[in-house]
């Protein structure tokens, strides 16, 4: 629901929400984002109603809501990756990483709840194993994207790396805390243990929160356009978007 409200900021005004419904543009990524978001919210509400009524169809609605959640993450990732004006987002890794982060944060929250409610050691071990595996996938994707950015050697990548450097502490929190949690959950002596699972889940939640901040901060701080002037070999540089024009 909070993400649905956040779409209003992208629309510019609440009155534009009606235009999204009446005059929807199927070529717009934001339109598909709205469809996926609304579908997920509706199915989630129906599932909660079925749980409250103890209906037999709870599992069916749970599967449908789960599929809608996966589709939502893919659409969200595609929405970001198609924004070519923001080099920090414009990467094919983004949709896959969105899925990985969804599993990481989701299972970390479930693991935290399981620890608080005193779940069995077998359940904690199973949840921890899935969460740690998802963390490994996310970290590999994040490091691959960073290596690609270093090897690109373009003005856009230089601006992005500069923005990352200015937020290096936040970036390290994003990587190090989930890495520590992954090691804790993978260690045989910690499997099924409440205290390590509780600490690891908290570390993951903090790390993923830092990841979401890093998703926004470098994208908006890095120059969106580059200006290249003819005449010399050293004329390519960042061009601020604030003037509202791009000059050749």
PLM features per residue range, with description:
Residues 1-19, 23, 29-54:
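Transmembrane-helix bundle segments that line or gate the permeation/cavity pathway
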Residues 1-2, 24, 66, 201-203:
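Short hydrophobic "helix-edge" motifs at membrane interfaces and signal-peptide entry regions
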Residues 8-31, 77-97, 146-168, 216-246:
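Membrane-interface interhelical loops and short amphipathic "cap" helices
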Residues 37-38, 43-200, 207-210, 214:
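Long, contiguous internal "core" modules enriched in hydrophobic/ aromatic residues
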Residues 184-187, 192, 197, 201-228, ...:
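Feature marks hydrolase-like catalytic cores characterized by long aromatic- and Gly/Pro-rich stretches
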């Amino acid at each position: 629901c909070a993400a649905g409200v956040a779409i209003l900021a992208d629309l510019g005004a609440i009155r534009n929400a009606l235009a999204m419904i009446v005059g929807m543009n199927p070529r717009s990524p934001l339109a598909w984002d709205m469809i996926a978001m609304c579908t997920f919210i509706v199915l989630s509400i129906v599932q909660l109603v079925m749980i409250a009524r103890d209906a037999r169809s709870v599992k069916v609605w749970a599967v449908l809501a789960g599929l809608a959640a996966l589709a939502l993450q893919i659409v969200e990732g595609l929405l970001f990756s198609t924004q070519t004006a923001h080099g920090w987002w414009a990467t094919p890794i983004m949709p896959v990483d969105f899925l990985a982060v969804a599993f990481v944060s989701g299972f970390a929250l479930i693991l935290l709840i399981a620890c608080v409610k005193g779940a069995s050691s077998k359940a904690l071990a199973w949840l921890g194993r899935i969460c740690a595996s998802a963390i490994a996938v996310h970290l590999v994707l994040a490091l691959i994207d960073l290596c690609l950015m270093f090897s690109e050697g373009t003005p856009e990548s230089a601006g992005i790396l500069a923005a990352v450097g200015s937020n290096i502490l936040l970036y390290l929190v994003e990587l190090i805390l989930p890495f520590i949690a992954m090691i804790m959950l993978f260690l045989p002596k910690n499997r099924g243990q409440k205290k390590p699972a509780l600490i690891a889940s908290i570390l993951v939640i903090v790390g993923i929160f830092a990841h979401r901040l890093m998703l926004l901060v470098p994208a908006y701080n890095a120059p969106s356009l580059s200006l290249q002037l003819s005449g010399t070999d050293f004329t390519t540089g960042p061009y601020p978007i604030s003037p509202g024009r791009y000059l050749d």
